[in-house]
């Protein structure tokens, strides 16, 4: 097997369901140390974080990834055991194959080869890994970014190995991400018998106009490469299960994916004003997952576009779509951030997989990116 395939299989065999690293970072740190990297373990609580650096000074290029994976779901639904890597018809199967143990393995193989070829390279090459990307994302890169901000750690460029490709490796370059804001809304009513509505207050009826306005609102028309801001209701519940009882309260969960027209405080104020205008008796709890970030045209984008175009024979699509990633914690440090990784068709699914040809091409892509940025 190739170096990257062998290492990916070793990582898949470690059942690192978030936030358990299951020994992945110890394995990777040993390899990076052997290649000459300085490794610092920044563990917090149950979360493992690894910061490995080679070289000194600016510019600083970070390869950002995570060693944790999502749960497998019913293991009997998998064609083969999710933590026993299997290759069938040129495809590697296993939890984390695409998201993102393949990218992490490719980072390490590319870093090893780069420092072997350029032992005295300018600037600093760093690898940052966490076991808290798929979970709460509090004690992982968010924590490390706070440490970096406190000590003035500079980061110029960040390449995240999230599975960004859609049909073929390198067909999409992620140049930003939307912000994410979640809310839990509870509308208070008065429970009663459906035959005596005058003695009750139905929170469903009261909240319906406000929810309709929230869902119908056009928040903006997009922002540069970003789509329009979107609010989606994800859960709604009221009632006792009986059809003769007016419920006493209504619970609604919703999420907003927003572009740089907005920030979390502005959205919170806007929605609070709407609820107040409808005269609801309510409580509202917010959870801020991260603000949007965007990498404008510049050195990193231009080099990444050129490297991917060489691989696929055409310019990649450049997008800010998809969910959140840990790059949202690195961007506020002043870094230009992009995401380049495998095809994402099977991520978080039963029989997650990556094409072996794509996996074996990935270290070369990453190494070319590093060389053009640092050499």
Curated annotation (Swiss-Prot):
Pathway: Amino-acid biosynthesis; L-lysine biosynthesis via DAP pathway; LL-2,6-diaminopimelate from (S)-tetrahydrodipicolinate (succinylase route): step 3/3. The active site is at residues 68, 133. Its cofactor is Zn(2+); Co(2+). It comes from the Bacteria. It holds the Pfam family M20_dimer. Catalyzes the hydrolysis of N-succinyl-L,L-diaminopimelic acid (SDAP), forming succinate and LL-2,6-diaminopimelate (DAP), an intermediate involved in the bacterial biosynthesis of lysine and meso-diaminopimelic acid, an essential component of bacterial cell walls. This is Succinyl-diaminopimelate desuccinylase.
């Amino acid at each position: 097997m190739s170096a990257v395939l062998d290492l990916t299989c070793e990582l898949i065999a470690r059942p690192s369901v978030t936030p358990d690293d299951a020994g992945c970072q110890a394995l990777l740190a040993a390899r990076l140390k052997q290649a000459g990297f300085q490794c610092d373990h920044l563990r917090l609580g149950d979360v493992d974080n690894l910061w490995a650096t080679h070289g000194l000074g600016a510019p600083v290029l970070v390869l950002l990834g995570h060693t944790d994976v999502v749960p497998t779901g019913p293991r009997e639904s998998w064609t083969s055991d999710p933590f026993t890597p299997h290759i069938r018809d040129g495809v590697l199967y296993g939890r984390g194959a695409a998201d993102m143990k393949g990218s992490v393995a490719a980072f390490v193989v590319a870093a090893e080869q780069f420092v072997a070829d350029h032992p005295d390279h300018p600037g600093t090459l760093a690898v940052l890994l966490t076991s808290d990307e798929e979970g709460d994302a509090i004690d992982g890169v968010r924590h490390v970014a706070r440490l970096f901000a406190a000590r003035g750690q500079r980061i110029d460029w960040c390449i995240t190995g999230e599975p960004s490709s859609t049909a073929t490796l390198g067909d999409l370059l992620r140049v930003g991400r939307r912000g994410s804001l979640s809310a839990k809304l509870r509308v208070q009513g008065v429970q009663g018998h459906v035959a005596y509505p005058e003695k009750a207050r139905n929170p469903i009826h009261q909240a319906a106009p406000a929810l309709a306005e929230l869902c119908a609102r056009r928040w903006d028309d997009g922002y540069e490469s970003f789509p329009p801001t979107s609010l989606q209701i994800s859960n709604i519940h009221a009632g006792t299960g009986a059809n003769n009882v007016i419920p006493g309260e209504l619970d609604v969960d919703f999420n907003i994916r927003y572009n740089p027209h907005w920030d979390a405080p502005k959205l919170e104020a806007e929605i609070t004003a709407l609820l107040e205008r409808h005269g609801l008796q309510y409580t509202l709890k917010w959870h801020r997952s991260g603000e949007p970030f965007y990498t404008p045209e510049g050195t990193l984008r231009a080099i990444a576009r050129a490297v991917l175009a060489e691989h696929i024979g055409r310019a990649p699509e450049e997008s800010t779509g998809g969910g959140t990633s840990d790059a949202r914690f690195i961007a506020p440090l002043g870094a230009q951030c992009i995401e380049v990784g495998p095809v994402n068709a099977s991520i978080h699914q039963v029989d997650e997989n990556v094409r072996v040809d794509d996996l074996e091409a990935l270290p070369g892509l990453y190494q070319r990116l590093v060389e053009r940025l640092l050499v």
